[in-house]
């Protein structure tokens, strides 16, 4: 079994480095991303959710460099996840109409207001690999997983995640979008969306999840249970651009 895992990881590494002959892994080459989880102020969950739903058309109209934008909800936490064509597009987004409107309304809608409730929760990242979105607007549920590399293992974890996008594209038709992210030298994340919970269940029983689970004790701080599973956060999707 271990030999099979090592052989598969070797194949993944080859995929990650052979960029000219595997076009699908470059679907978001040089793209950036951002994730912000924001606690709603007391009594403002519904109002905050409505605000985010109303923001989606504005993002579409005013931010051509924002490739994807998702408004998300997990009970009293609202979140935004977005993908940008480059760093400049991300900067434009944060100085745009929607960011300005959120700034103006943050004191009322967000626990902690703009600085403590929004800015302090921004996680910017670079895209390592992705499965290009399909049937985007049929998605109803999303998952975000934060992952910290074990000491000295960030490079190997980055290699695995970089190679995983094409595998998801080849083997997971129910995963409608999947992206691996690097936040900083040691921290990574995965974001994916599904039409329903059956798609998520299939994903977590899939090949990439199996490879990550097999290597988590070596590559991930806390291993599989404490370093991956404990950091899984599921969301309902409120709106998509």
Describe the predicted segments one by one:
Residues 121-147:
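Surface-exposed beta-loop interaction hotspot
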Residues 54-70, 83-121, 167-177, 193-232:
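An amphipathic, aromatic/His-enriched active-site/gating alpha helix that lines ligand/cofactor pockets
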Residues 1-9:
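Bacterial N-terminal signal peptides that target proteins for export
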Residues 9-17:
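Bacterial N-terminal signal peptides
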Residues 31-39, 79, 140-148:
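Active-site-flanking beta-strand signature of metal-NTP-handling nucleotidyl enzymes
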Residues 19-23:
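Sec/Tat signal peptide C-region and signal peptidase I cleavage site
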Residues 38-50, 147-159:
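Short, surface-exposed ligand-recognition loops at beta-strand->loop->(often short) alpha-helix junctions
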